[in-house]
Amino acid sequence: MKKITLLIILLLSAVCHAQMKSGKDVFDTARYGTVAEMKQLEAKDKNIINSVSPMGFTPLILACYRGNTEVAEYLAKHVKDINYKSDNGTALAAAAVKGDINMAKVLLENKADPNIADPLGVTPLVYAVQFENTELIKLLLEYKASKTYKDKEGRTPLDHADFTKNQEVINLLKN
């Protein structure tokens, strides 16, 4: 019995070591890898960058949430659906939540739709308003984010702005 237990432990150790040596999967690479690593994965499987994790995230969404700018920029230019919607929204929503104006611009330049809401009906513009990120609000409005879209509670971006009491944010939405 001891020999079998020892054999199982050695086998599991070898498997774990092999997995560690083999590198990161596409989702780990999206979070904290490099463009070169992403290209290596893509060379093995062209569609891997369009994968969806068990939690419902694409590599692009994960790269945006983690602030892995170079990988996110690469993915934004190469994925099939830049507007893929997870249970937590799109890659653009992730950039808005993170307050990453540069990433939002890259996504918008690559045809990200600023009017796709998450399951709660919240759009990237509403996130930008809630975080009082005036530069991001301006950018989203430049790319035709809807000022009149209502979330599931019937509130518009201006309603959210009124709650912040930030006059600059309110004025951006009134003009």
Summary of predicted features, one role per range:
Residues 52, 84-85, 117, 150:
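Ankyrin-repeat boundary/linker signal
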Residues 4, 17-44, 54-57, 61, ...:
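Intrinsically disordered, low-complexity regulatory segments in ankyrin-centric signaling systems
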Residues 48-49, 82, 114, 147:
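Ankyrin-repeat inter-repeat connecting loop/turn
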Residues 28-34, 62-68, 94-100, 127-133, ...:
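Ankyrin repeat A-helix N-terminal signature
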Residues 34-42, 68-76, 100-108, 133-141, ...:
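Ankyrin repeat structural motif
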Residues 10-17:
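Hydrophobic h-region of N-terminal signal peptides that target proteins for export
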Residues 147-175:
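Leucine-rich solenoid repeat scaffolds
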